A protein has these predicted regions:
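Rhodanese-like catalytic fold shared by cysteine-dependent sulfurtransferases
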Residues: 1-25, 32-71, 80-118
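Short, surface-exposed ligand- or partner-binding patches at beta-edge/loop junctions that are enriched
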Residues: 75
Length: 118
């Protein structure tokens, strides 16, 4: 748990989950241009930029994120936007959501540099 009060997981916990093959959605809330610089390639990855989410709200969420009880791990560049989106989802009834602390930048620095950094 972070000072913002939203549930969090570390980049190490994310790596363990990615390697375990478990069932969850990795929701990347970065803007489209950011994906050109760094991305975790995984079939569980779904992308919805924060700007699109702010505009369209719940209608913008991918189908895989509609299950309010399914596990959703939210990632962004450094963890700020993912914490905001995690809070937003929790206030709208999602129950199993966590922000990835440090974001994709932390993942690239601590786990896998091949995902890229910017």
């Amino acid at each position: 748990m972070k000072n913002s009060g939203v549930p969090e997981i570390s980049v190490h916990e994310l790596a363990d989950k990615l390697n375990s093959g478990g069932s969850f959605v990795l929701l990347d809330v970065r803007e489209a241009w950011e994906l050109d610089y760094a991305m975790i390639v995984d079939s569980r990855l779904k992308v919805i930029p924060t700007s699109r989410l702010a505009q369209l709200r719940e209608k913008a969420l991918p189908e895989e994120v509609q299950d309010k009880d399914g596990e959703i791990l939210v990632i962004c560049h450094t963890g700020v936007r993912s914490a905001q989106v995690t809070h937003w989802l929790l206030t709208r009834g999602w129950t199993n959501v966590a922000s990835v602390r440090g974001g994709i930048d932390g993942y690239a620095k601590q786990i896998d540099a091949s995902v890229g950094k910017y």
